[in-house]
Amino acid sequence: MAPDDSAIPARVVTSLPLAFTAGAAVGALGGMIGLGGAEFRLPLLIGLFGFAALAAVILNKAMSLIVVLTALPARLATVPPADLGAHWTVVVNLLAGSLLGAWAGASWAVRMRGATLYKVLAALMVLMAAALVLTHTATVGALPLPGPVRAVAGVAAGFGIGVVAAIMGVAGGELLIPTIVLLYAIDIKVAGSLSLLVSLPTMLVAFARYSRDGSFAVLRSNLRFTVTMVAGSIAGALLGGLLLGVIPDRVLIPALAVILLISAAKLARHAPPDARQAGLPDN
C-alpha cells in the first residue's frame, strides 16, 4: 500500500543534541532501577520527536537491541558461566514461547491500524507501570508448580512477553526477570543475566518479522538519529548505575510509575488522522 500522507506526522524532530540528551535521560532512569529504560524512550519517540507509532516501535527496538548487546558482556561477567549453564533449560523453556510471541507480536503490530496501535501501546504502558511497582515493592517468591505445569507456564509466559516486547520495541527484562524468579526460584542476579539470553534472540526474531514488511526504512532514514540516541542511552545508563540507591526506591519507583501512566494517557489520546500507519508499507 502506498504511504498515506494524512497519517504522517506534520513534524519529525531529529535534532542530534536533543536525541543524545533524551537518550541520556532515559538511560539514567533505567540505570537507577537496573533496566534499559526502553519503556520510557518509546513515548519520547512519539510525543517529543513526532514519529508515528510503528516507526517509533521499530526505532525503539533497534536501540534496545544495541543497548542489550552493549550490556551483555558486562552483565554476563557478573555471573559465573557455570551458574548460567546450570539453568540452560530455563532459557530454552522461555524461548520456546518468546520466539513465537515475538513473531506474532510484530505481525500484529504491522497489521494494526494506527489508532489501535496507540491504544495498545497505552495499555502496555499501564502494564509496565504495574510490573514496575509490583517487582520493586513486593517480595517475589517461587510458585510451587509441578515440573510439567511449570514448563507449560514458561512457554505461555514467554509467548506473552515476546508479544509485549515486539509491540513495544523493548527487551522485556521488566517482565522476564520476575517471571524467572517466580517460575523457577532463581536468584534475581542470575535471573537478570538469563533474561538477556532470552531477550536477544527474541528481539532478533521480531526484527526479522518487521523486515519482511519493509519497515526498516525508518532505520535507514534515521540512522544518525538512532546512533546518537543510543549513545546517549548508554551514557545515561552508566550514570544511572552510579546513582543507583541515591534516590530511595520508595520515592523513585512511584515517580517512574506515574511517568509511565502519564505517558500512557497521552498515547491513548494520540490517534493519527488516518488509522493506517504512517509512511510504512502494508503487507
Residue ranges and their predicted role:
Residues G27-A28, I33-L35:
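Single transmembrane alpha-helix segments in multi-pass membrane proteins
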Residues V57-L65, G192-T202:
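Transmembrane helix-bundle signature of multi-pass membrane transporters/permeases
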Residues A38, S64-R75, G105, T202-Y210, ...:
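Alpha-helical transmembrane segments and their lipid-water interface positions
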Residues G34-R41, I167-T179:
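Transmembrane helix boundary and interhelical junction motifs in multipass membrane proteins
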